[in-house]
Each structure stands twice: as C-alpha cells, then as structure tokens.
Curated annotation (Swiss-Prot):
This is Large ribosomal subunit protein eL15z. GO terms for molecular function: mRNA binding; structural constituent of ribosome. Gene3D superfamilies: Ribosomal protein l15e (3.40.1120.10). The lineage of its organism: Eukaryota, Viridiplantae, Streptophyta, Embryophyta, Tracheophyta. The gene is RPL15A. Residues 193-204 have a biased composition (Polar residues). It comes from Arabidopsis thaliana (Mouse-ear cress). Belongs to the eukaryotic ribosomal protein eL15 family.
Amino acid sequence: MGAYKYVSELWRKKQSDVMRFLQRVRCWEYRQQPSIVRLVRPTRPDKARRLGYKAKQGFVVYRVRVRRGGRKRPVPKGIVYGKPTNQGVTQLKFQRSKRSVAEERAGRKLGGLRVVNSYWLNEDSTYKYYEIILVDPAHNAVRNDPRINWICNPVHKHRELRGLTSEGKKNRGLRGKGHNNHKNRPSRRATWKKNNSLSLRRYR
C-alpha cells in the first residue's frame, strides 16, 4: 500500500484514539487563529489530491471556520412584515450546507483566485472547519496545465457563488439522474417557472 492509502485509512477511523487526540488538539489550535487562514500544505493530502489539488505553483489551500447552527433571518430588531405564516425569524433552515458557505467566504475574500473544491476538516460544538482548494488563473503553471486550465476561462469567475462547485451542485439537487430528478433541472426555480407560466401558443 502507498502512503496515501494509510493516511486515508487513518481519516476513515475518526473515532480511533490517535485521531480523537489529534483532532482535539488541532481544534484548539484552529480556535485561536483567524476565521480564514492560508496553509502551507493541506492537512489531508490524500483528500486534497482526490479533489484536484497539486503541490505546484498556482495552487493554494485556505482553512475556513464557519459557525454552526441555524440561520437567523437578518431583520432589524426582529421586525418582519407580511402574513404571520411568513414571519418566522429563528427556526428557519438554510438551504445550503456549511461547506458551501465556507467556499463562498473564501471566494469573496480571495477575489483573484478560483475555488476548485473543498473538504471537511474538523468540528467542535461551535464551529466547523473546512479546507478550500483555490488556484490562481493568472499563473503560468495553471494556464499551461491542460488538466486545470479550463478554470482560467472567465465563465468560471466566482463559481462558488453560483452553485457550480461540487458542493454547490449537491445543494441544488443535481447529484441524481433519471425521472426522479427531472424537476431539479435546469434548476428548481426554472422548472417551477415553466410549470406556472401560462403559455398560449399562437394558432397558425
């Protein structure tokens, strides 16, 4: 077995004594640092490589901290308008995952980079931690690599904000195929709009 196989086996057994101790110590360290931190190398090299990371120029990894819990509706002093059924503030369920929020925050902070992918790293009672893989689309090492230079195309600017990363597509319900999923494509809103628009074809 190669070294990456051993590393991935370690990460699969997260309840082992070694991993529980490591994760607890690391979590303490992460709590002391800012919410978005650049790393020298990925903490999970096997996972990062599976998701597109390469240890070469132009590739960077950032750790992002996201607060756990539900999303409160951002209304000043809790003043909401409309019918009582739509006046909820606290027990609303956010439609995207914490991982996609982490990708979004990294993408906003680092506007010149492109988000490739991300993965779970750690969590405690208050926060979840993710590592985000980003590339520099202006770097020649990226532009000349046929495996990644697709991301230099301007249509891939801020793909994390438009639900185009792996996690974004998952949150949009685009992982499945077949007749059970045809209402999710091209998007749930587009399908709703098509089904709720009265279209009177002109008689010719």
